[in-house]
Amino acid sequence: MSKFDLSALETFVRTIPQHYKGPGGAVAVLKDGKVVLRHAWGFADLSTRKAMTPETRMPICSVSKQFTCAVLLDSVGEPEVLDDALAAYLDKFAEKRPSVRDLCNNQSGLRDYWALTVLCGADPEGVFLPEQAQSLLRRLKTTHFAPGTHYSYCNGNFRILADLIEQHTGRSLIELLSERIFQPAGMKTAELIPDTALFDECTGYEGDTVRGFLPAVNRIHWMGDAGICASLDDMIAWEQFIDATRDDESGIYRRLSGLQTFSDGAAAPYGLGLKFEETGGKRLTGHGGALRGWRCQRWHCADERLSTIAMFNFEGGASDVAFKLMNIALGVPTSEQVRVAADAVWFGSWLDHETGLVLSLEDAGRGRMKARFGTGPEMMDVVGENEARSSMTAIRRDGDTIHLAREDENLSLTMQRLKGAAKQDIAGHYRSDELEADLLIVDEGGAFYGAFEGFLGKSDMYSLYEAGPDVWLLPVQRSMDAPSPGEWKLVFHRDAKGEITGMTVGCWLARHVDYRRIQE
């Protein structure tokens, strides 16, 4: 690590309100367990003119997951202790069940339950109760990949963990977090508040400077996967606790941040509620958080005893800020990727037949392409005539085939170019037996729309757009959780006579959900 440059950090922090436009936020940097930068700006509530301060509590969203796993290790023991309880929880499974460690490492193969709420007809701003979460999770019978083989983000993993921990200990997660984690770490105001509608100390905002900023509505009951509210000072205390216990091999963060692997022995990018990253040759551990109106990110570099924290009450780039703060603190130089012009043969849609996932590519200018594959668009640098990559994805084109690799996910796909037009006979009623949910597709004046129906209600109508023969895209930009599932990929199946018999519906968070056509 080069010499620590506090002035460079301070210079960057002064630019945050201009480059990340929104109501307010708070950031901190720690070195050797001491706070070297602690700053808040803007407003916790625009209408009441309540200022944002380091003491202002905000939802830390999915950053909560590491604390759930910390309670597991501290009050239960190793994840394997709960494997039998998980088997009883997922009692409808028709194939190999994941282990509790698979849940902790996001290798379970379970489809994300927030994505599945869309298929079950949920209102994005509706109430979601604990019993509804259990009803959805306990009806699952399949995974979208064999447990332990790949990485896929799944909030439901941690919701199940919370249920299992409470069942095993006979105590609430609220009590366990306070007693086992927050009090020992000196996180004086941190608290699990499961019902997001009850939190009113700070307002989270949707929107931007073009549309304006409006208070975001959240009426979800969280447990295990999110729900903790904490101030910047609480998060600073967590980083100081991590540093103070750094040499204790039995210390909770040492145990949380250990290396994890996939079933084939390959290194995994995630474990026990922590994301693993690397910058400047240094290993980082941390996590991001997102809920409608909120963004949060923390990173810790054990080798250099460095930590960075960013918390926003708007949907801005807190993850980007925390990572840039870490790079500045480490003295990692910035470099511009050398790019070549993107040939038009890249552009269009590409299908992986096994997973039903679609990669859509379009020109973004200056040697870049905008790719849609996961939960949101990612910018890809074209680094050669037939090669492009982003921070998450590498693709190589060979004629009408793209080889896609996401090394962190242990995922390799072979995708074929979609050519030709889609048949216009998709209107009908489709049923997912596993979810006990329906998808209704209608033709209204030559335009197709789809609506989801299930135990959570009936959704609005969503537009459908053809991507190629028997492949359609159904964008969903608002859901209960953030980010939304993005584009649902609908891949239709036909019999020997050419009649549609069913389809698979999927997105990166929830792949290959089978639907059969109901003849009416």
Swiss-Prot record:
Catalytic activities: Release of an N-terminal D-amino acid from a peptide, Xaa-|-Yaa-, in which Xaa is preferably D-Ala, D-Ser or D-Thr. D-amino acid amides and methyl esters also are hydrolyzed, as is glycine amide
One GO MF term: aminopeptidase activity
Keyword Protein transport: no
This protein's record includes keyword Zinc: no
E.C. code: 3.4.11.19
GO biological process, alphabetically ordered: proteolysis
InterPro entries: Bact_CellWall_Synth/Modif, Beta-lactam-related, Beta-lactam/transpept-like, D_amino_pept/lipop_sf, DAP, DAP_B_dom
Catalytic residues identified in the record: S62, K65
Annotated region described as Important for specificity, given as residue ranges: 477-487
Pfam families for the chain: Beta-lactamase, DAP_B
Family: Belongs to the peptidase S12 family.
NCBIfam families the UniProt entry points to: PRK13128.1
Quaternary context: Homodimer.
The protein's name in its UniProt record: D-aminopeptidase
